[in-house]
């Protein structure tokens, strides 16, 4: 799926054994999970910044924007990635959980996720 990003960027969708994984890659608020797949078991979503920076010149989703889009598309499990270095992963997680309505994880170096 073509990402919402000034530089052409693809967000891959992988389906294995009936389970669907979607990675938004670098993507802005125009990303729509429904364009990637009708049912998503695990989404790894760009969440570079917090909602305080929405609407600015940063071409990436906030934690809240990623969560709202995932919630609206019925994504079963949401993992945030591409956080700005030095930012607080727990602040991103908390903001996303408030919008998503369920648990959200943050991908940190060395993390692995099983679908």
Regions found by a protein language model. Give the residues of each.
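Cap/insert and terminal regions of metallo-dependent hydrolase folds
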Residues: 29-112
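Core dinuclear metal-dependent hydrolase active-site scaffold
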Residues: 1-35, 109-115
